[in-house]
């Protein structure tokens, strides 16, 4: 995130933040070195206190900084300055590095190169670069200073301050305004004849109370009002498959509209204090830097009106209406009486969006409306089609660790206004809506329908007018990677600035990873998009950045994420269990699917089952066919979406087929989730919220790792959107894509293709066994290899 800066500009910025004293030109080299080093020590509040602390820093293995300065040096060597710099950055001499070889430590941690400093000009620029360098705690040194109170000297000035293109924490976090308003919707989802009131929580700098207008970071969070725990009532998945031709193509039916009044000239200050807490670290970080943080769950949320209708156009409309209030185009009231209007007069009219999972999903939904004022989205782990979240290729497919969840259950989780005991209108309407969702989502057949079509945001991507950042985990089996892959294929073709980050996590945030300065990049991004400052953000990093699965500190810069990043390679499974690039398969092989019976007997978790299954444990072998490649002689990277063709017959008139690609070979792999190195060690500002430094690290050796997988209903052999009759013993040709990937197989690894039926963590788990016969002559795997 460091923006290349001229020495002249660096000097100007250092003067502006009172780091470089006005009289610097009259100071000697040694005096300036003492002052600049002392200024980093923000916890020392007087010059005497700062000078006293200089003796705590070693220049080499014999001399402390105070003693070094007594000789009034006119220069400092690269090694000496590196020692001082590393200690200022939080590294411990003799523990983290040797005082006799600090340059090696700098190289190890990818710090800027140190050099001999022989003039005051070089010294000043070296400190400018140092302030922009990441410390041991993962933050740039300037942010470490902020956590110690350096920028409290600017509290109350009521203006943004920028440094290296990024906003500084100069806003008084001890006096943040926390308020609630009620936006009136055009929707009447609870059927009471009035527009639903949508509670909106605002956290904004106290400085915005006067003349300063600030941009807003809006997080559309259905969870903000609270979460109703209903896991125990999730749908039963231990049931036999249903004939998909009973499908009736459930329709989407729009809710009635009640036109809201236009905003008047009235503007009464908010009268309700916010008791809810910000739930997103990036927002808190940027709140201290002048960006208001706005949260709303919209329809169905606590203290508000309406009914949660998961993924529906109504959900999109209600969340969009919050932005319309922020830009002055919609009415909001101080309370539920609807008597006094209140405006977002503090807002500049520039809005960005943040959030992960459902919160990221609603960014996509709102962006497709092209709503005025929305300048950018940073959408993490987002659903781009609800069918791709709860279904796949004609099957009911659960998100990871959410077996039995569906649209109706998620709506219940987020219907927090049910906790408002007096809201009898919501309760009655909610029960009716639950019945409608249960019927329309069609858990019996799993087929695509008009209901799901209305919940596919990708079909409205042409409406996107704002800049775009997508963030997703390549190992996210909750919101599976094709959600981001398929919206990316749309967005990259639009005339908007767009970027993509892919990390090695599951359903996870990446803003505090050691290996990338993501938070600083987002600071730079939002300054450009919402403060409208030309700071080079668009050119600062590549179009696509992908974290390596072998070395967590390596990120690949790519121009795109698509099949054409690689070359097509065709593999054929053979009767003797090989996955071959030179031999075509012949003959037929049969496996017996056991449904969920053996899994239930084993009494293990879905995660444990998956590891045992992909590792090839014998007790699961009967329920699959496995084909292994030869060992790879060189590292090989798979990109894009693998495709399989399987000619298969089942001994029943229904069937489900699953396919997995697995990396085989006992070795250390990265942890599934990042390891936290120090909890709460990254303060966002002075005496404010904090985050924890973390990263993926090598874990204990494992036998196998899932690369990607997919599932398909045998009855969709003719059409993915139209089921057909299936006869017992009838061979059908299935062709479908697996989840997209970017995965490097190291030398010595084997690639394994597994063909099976019941996926215990995702598919239904039939109560009966079923035989599947695969015709190898009609079966192949297409990969894209870099």
Swiss-Prot record:
Major subcellular site: cytoplasm
* SUPFAM superfamilies named in the record: alpha/beta-Hydrolases (SSF53474), Galactose-binding domain-like (SSF49785), X-Prolyl dipeptidyl aminopeptidase PepX, N-terminal domain (SSF81761)
Q: Which GO terms describe its biological process?
A: proteolysis
Checking Pfam families in the record gives: Peptidase_S15, PepX_C, PepX_N
Q: Which UniProt keywords apply?
A: Aminopeptidase, Cytoplasm, Hydrolase, Protease, Serine protease
Q: Which GO terms describe its cellular component?
A: cytoplasm
Q: Main EC class of this protein?
A: hydrolase
Role according to the record? Removes N-terminal dipeptides sequentially from polypeptides having unsubstituted N-termini provided that the penultimate residue is proline.
For this entry, the protein name equals Xaa-Pro dipeptidyl-peptidase
UniProt organism field: Lactobacillus delbrueckii subsp. bulgaricus
Q: Which gene encodes it?
A: pepX
């Amino acid at each position: 995130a460091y923006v290349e800066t001229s020495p002249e500009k660096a000097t100007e910025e250092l003067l502006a933040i009172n780091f470089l004293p006005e009289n610097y030109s009259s100071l000697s080299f040694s005096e300036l070195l003492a002052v600049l080093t002392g200024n980093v020590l923000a916890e020392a509040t007087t010059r005497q206190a700062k000078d006293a602390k200089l003796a705590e820093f070693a220049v080499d293995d014999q001399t402390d900084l105070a003693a070094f300065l007594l000789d009034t040096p006119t220069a400092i060597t690269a090694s000496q300055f590196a020692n001082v710099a590393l200690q200022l950055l939080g590294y411990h001499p003799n523990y983290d590095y040797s005082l006799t070889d600090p340059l090696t430590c700098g190289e190890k941690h990818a710090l800027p190169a140190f050099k001999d400093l022989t003039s005051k000009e070089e010294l000043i620029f070296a400190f400018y670069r140092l302030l922009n360098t990441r410390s041991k705690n993962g933050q740039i040194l300037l942010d470490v200073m902020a956590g110690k109170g350096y920028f409290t000297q600017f509290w109350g000035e009521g203006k943004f301050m920028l440094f290296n293109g990024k906003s500084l924490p100069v806003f008084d976090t001890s006096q943040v305004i926390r308020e609630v308003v009620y936006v009136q919707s055009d929707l009447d989802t609870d059927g009471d004849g009035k527009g639903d009131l949508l509670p909106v929580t605002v956290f904004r700098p106290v400085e915005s109370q006067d003349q300063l207008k600030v941009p807003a970071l809006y997080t559309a969070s259905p969870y903000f009002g609270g979460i109703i725990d209903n896991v125990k009532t999730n749908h039963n998945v231990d049931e036999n498959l249903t004939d998909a031709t009973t499908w009736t193509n459930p329709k989407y039916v729009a809710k009635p509209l009640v036109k809201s009044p236009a905003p008047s000239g009235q503007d009464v200050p908010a009268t309700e204090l916010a008791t809810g807490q910000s739930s997103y670290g990036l927002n808190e970080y940027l709140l201290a830097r002048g960006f208001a943080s706005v949260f709303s769950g919209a329809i169905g949320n606590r203290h508000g009106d309406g009914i949660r209708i998961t993924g529906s156009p109504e959900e999109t409309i209600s969340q969009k209406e919050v932005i319309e209030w922020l830009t002055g185009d919609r009415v909001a009231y101080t309370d539920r009486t609807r008597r006094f209007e209140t405006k977002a007069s503090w807002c500049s009219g520039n809005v960005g969006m943040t959030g992960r999972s459902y919160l990221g999903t609603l960014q996509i939904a709102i962006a497709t409306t092209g709503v005025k004022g929305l300048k950018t989205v940073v959408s993490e782990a987002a659903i781009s089609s609800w069918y791709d979240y709860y279904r796949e290729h004609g099957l009911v497919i659960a998100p990871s660790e959410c077996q039995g969840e569906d649209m109706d259950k998620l709506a219940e989780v987020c219907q927090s206004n049910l906790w408002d005991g007096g809201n009898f209108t919501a309760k009655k309407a909610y029960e009716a809506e639950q019945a409608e969702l249960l019927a329309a989502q069609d858990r019996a057949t799993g087929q695509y329908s008009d209901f799901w079509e209305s919940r596919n945001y990708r079909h409205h991507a042409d409406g996107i007018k704002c800049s775009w950042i997508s963030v997703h985990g390549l190992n996210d089996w909750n919101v599976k990677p094709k959600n981001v892959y398929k919206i990316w294929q749309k967005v990259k073709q639009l005339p908007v600035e767009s970027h993509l980050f892919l990390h090695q996590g599951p359903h996870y945030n990446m803003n505090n990873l050691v290996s990338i300065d993501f938070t600083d990049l987002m600071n730079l991004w939002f300054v450009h998009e919402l403060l409208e400052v030309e700071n080079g953000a668009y050119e600062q990093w590549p179009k696509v950045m992908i974290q390596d699965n072998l070395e967590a500190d390596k990120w690949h810069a790519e121009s795109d994420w698509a099949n054409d990043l690689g070359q097509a390679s065709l593999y054929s499974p053979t009767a003797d269990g090989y996955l071959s690039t030179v031999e075509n398969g012949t003959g037929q092989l049969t496996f017996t699917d056991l449904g969920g019976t053996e899994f239930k007997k084993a009494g293990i978790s879905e995660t444990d089952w998956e590891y045992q299954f992909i590792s090839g444990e014998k007790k699961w072998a009967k329920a699959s066919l496995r084909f292994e490649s030869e060992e790879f002689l060189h590292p090989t990277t798979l990109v894009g979406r693998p495709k399989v063709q399987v000619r298969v017959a089942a001994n029943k008139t229904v069937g489900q087929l699953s396919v997995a690609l697995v990396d085989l070979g006992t070795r250390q792999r990265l942890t599934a989730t990042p390891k936290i190195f120090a909890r709460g060690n990254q303060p966002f500002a002075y005496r404010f919220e904090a985050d924890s430094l973390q990263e993926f690290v090598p874990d204990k050796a494992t036998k196998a790792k899932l690369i990607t997988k997919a599932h398909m209903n045998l009855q969709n052999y003719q059409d993915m959107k139209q089921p057909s009759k299936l006869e017992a013993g009838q061979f059908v040709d299935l062709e479908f894509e697996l989840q997209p990937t970017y995965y490097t197989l190291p030398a010595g690894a084997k690639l394994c293709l597994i063909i099976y039926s019941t996926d215990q963590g995702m598919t239904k788990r039939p109560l009966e066994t079923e035989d599947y016969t695969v015709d190898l002559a009609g079966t192949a795997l297409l990969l894209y290899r870099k």
